[in-house]
Structure formats: structure tokens, C-alpha cells
Amino acid sequence: MRELPHVLGIVLAGGEGKRLYPLTADRAKPAVPFGGAYRLIDFVLSNLVNARYLRICVLTQYKSHSLDRHISQNWRLSGLAGEYITPVPAQQRLGPRWYTGSADAIYQSLNLIYDEDPDYIIIFGADHVYRMDPEQMMQFHIESGAGATVAGIRVPRSEASAFGCIDADESGRIREFIEKPADPPGTPDDPEQTFVSMGNYIFTTKVLIDAIRADADDDHSDHDMGGDIIPRLVADGMAAVYDFKNNEVPGATERDHGYWRDVGTLDAFYDAHMDLVSVHPVFNLYNKRWPIRGESENLAPAKFVNGGSAQESVVGAGSIISAASVRNSVLSSNVVVDDGAIVEGSVLMPGVRIGRGAVVRHAILDKNVVVGPGEMVGVDLDKDRERFAISAGGVVAVGKGVWI
């Protein structure tokens, strides 16, 4: 029987998420609710746990209370075999300063690595929507002999200029890591596609420690994993790209194989929700062989009364739709839509109340928003613009606890 390598998972969850405002006004970006029953961090944690990586440190910083609480309440492991998922707030172990970048977060947390003494370290971001089996990426990393492996997703070359792009040879070795190039490189097998970094990395431990320490001594560095650490290792010939297309998740459909979304803007966050609602969704939440674990509240089932209906929609537990119409929408837990109300193409987070005869279209309503009887959101954008955030794509975003 092959001895399993000793692996430590580190999840970078300190992001402020300014482009998701107002959803990040009171919480860290990884704590933003998603998909009716989850928070963004649940996707990366589910991927790691499903692959049996059960020693995980979640590095937090910005407005982390709800994130810390979510992890402690919903991600308890047994601990009997040294298993843990633990949030680690910025400790200021090296002086009175916060993290200045993702690489600095690792530098200030080197004690976690020394304590665990792993063979390999998985460093993943906390704010993407996807399924992935990290064990397959780990096997690629070990077999390639690289010191660092970057998960790369293929995008059309014509769209790649907005991302960090990877130029690799046929073996997967990275020749150059280029941030937002005007002329993106093609992949070795397709000149019309480009490898884009997913922000997920695997390192051989000594390679990471040496690179992190060298970066910390560099006064000209921004101390960023993608912007500084990976280019440093690329220059030394030590980095490889893992093709996400080759990742085979148990139970994945042909439609959602290779699905990955960066939901860092309101429009991207909205579009990712719309990927969930069709009969055959672009991203399937119902894969029992690779489950996404989320909130574990003990809630009653959703209820539809007085002819209330929901079509092409996701409706969370505890929600009640009474003589109302819901279409192409995602409703989280404990949402109430009252008589005669219409909700179309919208995302309603936990505890939202839609009053009698109200209309909500093309909108994101954060927790505990109340839309009064007869009120309208997303119908008159000029009026909405005076009081709410509106994305470039015309999505109206209403912050937590607002009464309309």
C-alpha cells in the first residue's frame, strides 16, 4: 500500500472583496452567502475534505467574525486522527502589522507549517465557485518533480488579457507567468486557448519556505503569491501548470465538467447564480458523489401556499412563497415572498422579506432586506441608482438589513 504524503492545506481567506460591495460591507468575501445554502468558502473546503485532506488552516483578516463562526459551526472534524479545519486570524507574530499580501500571510504563518511539518502544502483561494479533486493535482505535482504547481484553466486567447496568463511547454513546465498581457500565449496544444491561473497552488514544503523567506527580504516585492512567488519559481525553472481540464470529479456531468467561476464582481456573482437554476444547470449543486457542504441549520422545509410557485429556481429551507411568482431566481433560507409579489432573475439571501404585491427583478438582496408592499426593485434603474449600488451589467445590489 502506497504511503500517503503528509499534506497541509492553507486557504487564503483574508480578502476584502471591494468589487462585491455592498455584499462585503460587513463580512469577508469568502463569507458571502452563495447558492441558497452555502458560503463561498464552502466550495474550497468541500473540495479539500472530499479529497481527504483534513488538516486545514484558514487564514483570515478582514471582518472575519461571520467567517470564523461559520467554520466553527459547520466544519468541525473529529480531531481523533489529528484532523482539523481551523480559522487563523492575523496574529501579528512578526510585529504590529497586518498582512500586506497573500505571500506575506504565508510568511507570517510559517509557524503553522513548522508545527505540522508536511511534505507538501496546498494553498488555495477561498472565493471561487467550482468542484475539483485536489488529489489529482497533487499526483501531477509529485510526478512532475516541480517545486510549485499552478492550477490553470483554459480560456479563449481573445479573452485572456484580463488575467494572469501562463506560458508552458509540452511537459507542463512554466516558461513565463505574465500578468494581463496584451498578447496572451497559446497552450502547447491549442494556439487559440490560454492557460489562466486559478489561484490554486501546490508546493513542495522546502521550496515554498525558501521562496517565501526570500520574498520577505525583497523590499521591492508586493508579497503576492501570484505576482511574486510564482514568477520567482518560474525564473528558477521550478514551476509547472496543472491543466484543470484533466481533473475528473466523481459524479460530474458533461455540462459542468471543468466549471470554475471567479465571482469577484457583482455581475460575475450574479451570473454564477444564474448558472444554477435551469433544469440542466451549468453547475450542478446536486452531485452526491462530490457534495458541497454548507450551512447545517435545523430548518423546516420550504413551503408553497395559496398557489405560490417557483419555476427554474433554487429555494432554500424555511422559505415560504405565498400566492407569489418566483422565476429564474435563487432564494436562500428563511425567505418569505408574500401574496401577489413577483421575483424574477434575482438572488435573495437569508431572511429576505418581499411584501405583498412587490416586484423584484434582476437584483441581489443581501440578508434581512425587507421590500415593502407594492415596492419595486430593478424595475426603474434611474430611481434605484439614487439609493442602491448598480453593477455595470445593470444588477441592483441592496445591502444587508435595508428596508425599502
From Swiss-Prot:
EC number: 2.7.7.27
Protein's name in the database: Glucose-1-phosphate adenylyltransferase
GO molecular function, one term: glucose-1-phosphate adenylyltransferase activity
Pathway membership, UniProt: Glycan biosynthesis; glycogen biosynthesis
Family statement drawn from the similarity comment of this UniProt entry: Belongs to the bacterial/plant glucose-1-phosphate adenylyltransferase family.
Pfam families: Hexapep_GlmU (PF24894), NTP_transferase (PF00483)
Miscellaneous notes: Maltose-1-phosphate (M1P) is generated by two alternative routes: the TreS-Pep2 branch and the GlgC-GlgM branch, however it seems that the GlgC-GlgM branch provides most of M1P for the GlgE pathway in M.smegmatis.
Transmembrane segments annotated in the record for this chain: none
HAMAP family associated with the record: GlgC
Function: Involved in the biosynthesis of ADP-glucose building block, required in the biosynthesis of maltose-1-phosphate (M1P) and in the elongation reactions to produce linear alpha-1,4-glucans. Catalyzes the reaction between ATP and alpha-D-glucose 1-phosphate (G1P) to produce pyrophosphate and ADP-Glc.
